[in-house]
């Protein structure tokens, strides 16, 4: 049965941190748009950890879905060069806390303190690409790769973090996802269609920054960003221009004067040829001609570290069935509870659940709300089917419900199915 641990409330940068007494010595180490990160000591394991508080995860359905996606990804992606989830818990105030290993610093801070020697540039790039090979093999795009999302410890072990923006490899995507300096041109040009190659572009920008100690494309805004990219790469080729979906973007690009590319050997005169060659293969306008993470690992520049027997791929593709579902907050909430339960059941953390009376009340309330949403959605579906003279199965699979955008009632199917699943999962807490 679940263990009961005492929750302790404290203030960090004016933000309430409510964590179990298992974790002590809180110190702030980072702040993002969606959460505050503190270092702490795990008294049970006797080691330092990082604790990320997700701000108001259930305030909107969008934030609830984002938190659910990040949790699912952290559970699924297990690799030496990715941050590892060690524990997760829900506080009485309904805040979500992710506990991971503590890395000490990030690449952004490191680049601000000193220039990197060649062997460190090679080793860090190798680890980034090794992690990306695994991520991409799981059918996942990181979408927000940048120096501050690359964590490094005193042994120079590197881990990619912050998968909150990660998405499925899907032909239809949203545009504004990554920090501007590291944003691939296809995101700016099409805003809709892109794939894993966007991470390779970001890694190439980071590679250049490690070499030179400053960002390669420090755009002041969207237009300036595209302009300085073309200063180096020249005008985008016609086959890339033909993929632009936005009429306004197409008009803007075609109105620009033609620019010839600058040879990379000329732009990076003091850099060794192998490094320049790999960089040039990563920073290509046409994403389909950009080198893959797997191919980059076998490039001569990374020969000192390349080991084909120790560069694994994912055992299974990540399940994105939930990603197109437009569900109520209460349904996302109970689905989140089920993921927390599953994490501890399969041996995450210490294999036990931290729970209390307030938590039990949260589960009960959310279960009732999710059940109501499921019942209402199923009733609406049946009413619509009767009025249209159709008699289809209202318990359409979640996969079909979330991906069949052509059906007018597909989201009601999704709510009904996920709501019923949420009730089933939540009942497990009460056993």
UniProtKB/Swiss-Prot annotation:
GO terms for cellular component: cytoplasm; nucleus. Pfam families: Pkinase. It catalyses: L-seryl-[protein] + ATP = O-phospho-L-seryl-[protein] + ADP + H(+); L-threonyl-[protein] + ATP = O-phospho-L-threonyl-[protein] + ADP + H(+). Residues 23-302 form the Protein kinase domain. A motif (TXY) lies at residues 174-176. The modification Phosphothreonine is found at residue 174. Belongs to the protein kinase superfamily. Ser/Thr protein kinase family. MAP kinase subfamily. HOG1 sub-subfamily. PANTHER family: MITOGEN-ACTIVATED PROTEIN KINASE (PTHR24055). This is Mitogen-activated protein kinase HOG1. The TXY motif contains the threonine and tyrosine residues whose phosphorylation activates the MAP kinases. It comes from Zygosaccharomyces rouxii (strain ATCC 2623 / CBS 732 / NBRC 1130 / NCYC 568 / NRRL Y-229). Activated by tyrosine and threonine phosphorylation. It is found in: Cytoplasm; Nucleus. GO terms for biological process: stress-activated MAPK cascade. ATP binds at residues 29-37, 52. GO terms for molecular function: ATP binding; MAP kinase activity; protein serine kinase activity. Dually phosphorylated on Thr-174 and Tyr-176, which activates the enzyme.
């Amino acid at each position: 049965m679940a263990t009961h641990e005492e929750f302790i409330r404290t203030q960090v940068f004016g933000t309430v941190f409510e964590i179990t007494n298992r974790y002590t010595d809180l110190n702030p180490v980072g702040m993002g748009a969606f959460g505050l990160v503190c270092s702490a000591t795990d008294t049970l394991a006797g080691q330092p950890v990082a604790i990320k508080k997700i701000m108001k995860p259930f305030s909107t359905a969008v934030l609830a879905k984002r938190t659910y996606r990040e949790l699912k990804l952290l559970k699924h992606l297990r690799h030496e060069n990715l941050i590892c989830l060690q524990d997760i818990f829900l506080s009485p105030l309904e805040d979500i806390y992710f506990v991971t290993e503590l890395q000490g610093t990030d690449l952004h801070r490191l680049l601000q303190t000193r220039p990197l020697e060649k062997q460190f540039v090679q080793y860090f790039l190798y680890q980034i690409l090794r992690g990306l090979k695994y991520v991409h093999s799981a059918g996942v795009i990181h979408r927000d790769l940048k120096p501050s999302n690359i964590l490094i410890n005193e042994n120079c072990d590197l881990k990619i973090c912050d998968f909150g923006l990660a998405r499925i490899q899907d032909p239809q995507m949203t545009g504004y996802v990554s920090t501007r300096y590291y944003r691939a041109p296809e995101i700016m040009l099409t805003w809709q269609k892109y794939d894993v190659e966007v991470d390779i572009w970001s890694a190439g920008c980071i590679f250049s920054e490690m070499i030179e100690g400053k960002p390669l494309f420090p755009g002041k805004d969207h237009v300036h960003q595209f302009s300085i990219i073309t200063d180096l790469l020249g005008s985008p080729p016609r086959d890339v221009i033909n993929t632009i979906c936005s009429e306004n973007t197409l008009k803007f690009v075609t109105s620009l004067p033609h620019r010839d590319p600058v040879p990379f050997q000329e732009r990076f005169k003091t850099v060794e040829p192998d490094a320049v060659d790999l960089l040039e293969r990563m920073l290509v306008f046409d994403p389909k001609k950009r080198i893959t993470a797997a191919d980059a690992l076998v490039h001569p520049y990374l020969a000192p570290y390349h080991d084909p027997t120790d560069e694994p791929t994912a055992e299974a593709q990540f399940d994105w069935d939930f990603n197109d579902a437009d569900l109520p907050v209460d349904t996302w909430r109970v689905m989140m509870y089920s993921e927390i339960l599953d994490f501890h059941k399969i041996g995450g953390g210490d294999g036990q659940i931290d729970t209390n009376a307030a938590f039990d009340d949260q589960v009960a309330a959310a279960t009732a709300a999710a059940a109501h949403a499921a019942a209402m959605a199923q009733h609406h579906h049946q009413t619509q089917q009767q009025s249209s003279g159709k008699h289809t199965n209202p318990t359409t699979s979640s996969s079909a419900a979330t991906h069949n955008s052509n059906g007018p009632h597909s989201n009601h199917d999704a709510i009904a199915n996920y709501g019923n699943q949420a009730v089933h999962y939540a009942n497990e807490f009460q056993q």
